[in-house]
Amino acid sequence: MLRLSLLRSTATLPVKCQRRGLILPAAAMYTLGSLIFGKEARLADAMERGELHNKNVDYAKEAEERTELRIRALANTRPMEPRYNGHVPLHRYEKLLLFAISGWNSFFHPEDGYNIVQLGEATALPVFLENLKQTMLSDSSGRRILKEQPNITTEILHMDKLAKLPHNTFGYVYYQWLKRENVSPDTRAPVKFIDDPMHAYISKRYRQCHDFYHAITNMPIIIEGEITIKALEGANLGVPMAILGGILAPLRLKKVQRKRLYNIYLPWAVRTGLSCKPLINVYWEEMLEKDVTALRKELKITLPPDLRTMRKERAALRKEIDAKYNSQKRATTPA
């Protein structure tokens, strides 16, 4: 009996050892998992209750102070303190870099308005802006604009009212032009790199009035239209960037576009710019209910040939010529 019992015990020993070998690692894994995941669960609960943070510390205030320190550190690298909201003072070498980079980008990517804006500020020399200020000070409307410093926005212009004006008014013409070109007066970028606050406002006013020049001359915002209006601004106001644009921008156009500009639109822009009233002195917001034809006559602005119509006529002519060519080609090609 004793021998039989020993044999049975010996036979079952490997099975028990095997079970123990499985149970011990499983228990170890369970214990380790409980420690890890239990700790994470307790950590999450503590975070939710706010027990992890020092309740005596104002974290929002600390973040604000860190931001203020970074701003001060950056301000210490500037040549002067900001002189108006959004002003970014630049060193001379930074202004030269801005001119070089924005000029390069404007030439190769004129469709990007941000490049044009930067080039405009880089070339807006104080002597030019001071001359423009004197032009405004010499005129009663210009003086009022400088004193009141109006800001042109859709809210100020009341676009819903412009849509209901008589069709012969400048306001309705302007409203229709905005709709046709799918633009808004609210999209004008703020001035940042001009140091003198008054000069900055004059630059802002010039920028915001740009669409009025387009509307009163019925000029679209395609590249040819933009070059034409820039040439008008250059002749009328002496804007350096506008003069550069009128000279250099046509070089990248197609031959037919350059021909249109050189033969029709640039001569018109220069003549009109030199003969019409300084457009920077026009209080456009007060002209919206005026008859557009009378306003053009008052400002001595004559309309150029419709650029949209000329482009459509040329496209139709080219389509007709292509159709005739293809028809003749098919007729002469053997079956």
Curated annotation (Swiss-Prot):
A Gene Ontology cellular-component term: extrinsic component of mitochondrial inner membrane
Cofactors (names): Zn(2+)
Primary localization: mitochondrion
Binding site for Zn(2+): 210-211, 214, 226
Pathway, per record: Cofactor biosynthesis; ubiquinone biosynthesis
Key word Zinc present: yes
Catalytic activity reported: 4-hydroxy-3-methoxy-5-(all-trans-hexaprenyl)benzoate + H(+) = 2-methoxy-6-(all-trans-hexaprenyl)phenol + CO2
Keyword flag Membrane: yes
Transit peptide: 1-10
Subunit structure: Component of a multi-subunit COQ enzyme complex, composed of at least COQ3, COQ4, COQ5, COQ6, COQ7 and COQ9. Interacts with COQ3.
Family affiliation: Belongs to the COQ4 family.
Protein task: Lyase that catalyzes the C1-decarboxylation of 4-hydroxy-3-methoxy-5-(all-trans-hexaprenyl)benzoic acid into 2-methoxy-6-(all-trans-hexaprenyl)phenol during ubiquinone biosynthesis.
PANTHER family: UBIQUINONE BIOSYNTHESIS PROTEIN, UBIQUINONE BIOSYNTHESIS PROTEIN COQ4 HOMOLOG, MITOCHONDRIAL
Protein name according to UniProt: Ubiquinone biosynthesis protein COQ4, mitochondrial
Lineage: Eukaryota, Fungi, Dikarya, Ascomycota, Saccharomycotina
